[in-house]
Amino acid sequence: MSPLALVSVSDKKNIIPFCKELVEHFNYKILSSGGTAKHLIEAKIPVIKVADFTNSPEILGGRVKTLHPKIHGGILAIRTDEEHKKDIEANNLELIDLVVVNLYPFKKTVDGGAKWEDAIENIDIGGPSMIRSAAKNHKDVSVLVDSSQYQSFLEESKKGELKDSYKAKLALEAFQHTADYDTAISNWIRKERDLQSSKYIESYPLIKTLRYGENPHQKAFWYGLSNIGWNSAEQLQGKDLSYNNLLDLESALSTVLEFGYTEKDELATDMVASVILKHNNPCGASMSNSASKAFLNALECDSVSAFGGIVAFNSNVDSETAIHLKDIFLECVVAPSFDEEALEILKVKKNLRILKISKDQLPQKNQNSTKSIMGGLLVQDTDDSEEKTENWISVTNKNPSNQINLDLNFAWKICKHVKSNAIVIAKDQKTIGIGAGQMNRVGAAKIALKAAGRLCSDAVLASDGFFPFADTVEIANEYGIKAIIQPGGSLRDQESIDMCNSKGISMVFTQKRHFLH
């Protein structure tokens, strides 16, 4: 008896050559319905229509096609079970040996901004049911949910009877496919109706097995979406991305995005930004009127730490910038675009990873941030809400000048991306000292101020958290700091304010904290 394949696919990629191979080389009969049946018939592939197979028409506008005992009985029947054999004979069931199903494009529909009613109609019911039935009975039935599986199935079939391990692998992929589908639906409903879910469920396909994790003895895997973020970035040259590369690229790009992002010359004057990052902390950042100046200014902050670092730009990288980039050892450079001349110059650095990621490939704001803890997961909103300077308060007798305000704004944006406790010293739209990841705030201030040294005169200081004491103001004054920006909110705020007033320092409270752990 010829084997029977049930074929119902939304994505029809390679389905015609696959079904032709099934029919011509393996003597399969094809059972299908709706658009898939029409597609196969037009390609001269013989098809048994589901309605004829079940003797039941499609009803409810196509909502019910394959939800029938003859379909699911033919899939779920255990071939060696005597009771099942009796049911098969009593109900005149024909056994289905292969299920080839992929689902209505729900993600694509909702990503395109579909109305609620249209999205609901794109929730597949029959497809997941057939997939799950076949996956449950994978010992007797093979299930394919993606066109990438077709060729391997044909190759395995040519070897003879399919191995149990191969069919179990197909079942795993099938259940993951339906789990991913249900996750997309539940998350869409949660977001559309602004509901708090009692369960946190996300689904990401495996992008790549990484060489190792944070350290060589740790295994690591990269999961993600194929059409957004780093997986959609174009790597123009260089070695494969490592686990640490990806972490640092994420931090570098997140920082530079504070200042706009475009591959075209659409940025306002002096809004071209460059950030150099090492071990998940900025070690230099600058805004200028060109990418080359921004990079060189950022490099001046800490050229020692920049060695082996990551560089991010918020605008096009030209040949002048590339000349400076090739003079230092770097792991990665990321930007929205690169001139051909720039890429030619950077070719000499064969191991340098160059990534191009456009504005359209960036994820939307207001996503979730997650961290693993023992026995669970912490979930929070990402700290990417727009900074509203109208909420800032000048709390000292002396108000900052317009130029000082520009530097305060710049320093505050960089400080947000430095590990807590964080202090950033800036002057003329560039960092001149950064104190990161210290257990006390005054310790971070000492590191940043010492790094900046004599350049601190008329510079500004940003702190990601409030001052518990006036000691940070006191040491800042010793170095010549002229303005301070911090969240405020300490019980001893007045002591810091009084210290600023006595030293002629202006201070601004943002009323928003930016801890980063």
Curated annotation (Swiss-Prot):
This is Bifunctional purine biosynthesis protein PurH. Belongs to the PurH family. GO terms for molecular function: IMP cyclohydrolase activity; phosphoribosylaminoimidazolecarboxamide formyltransferase activity. The IMP cyclohydrolase activity resides in the N-terminal region. HAMAP family: PurH (MF_00139). It comes from Prochlorococcus marinus (strain AS9601). Residues 1-145 form the MGS-like domain. Its EC number is 2.1.2.3, 3.5.4.10. Pfam families: AICARFT_IMPCHas, MGS.
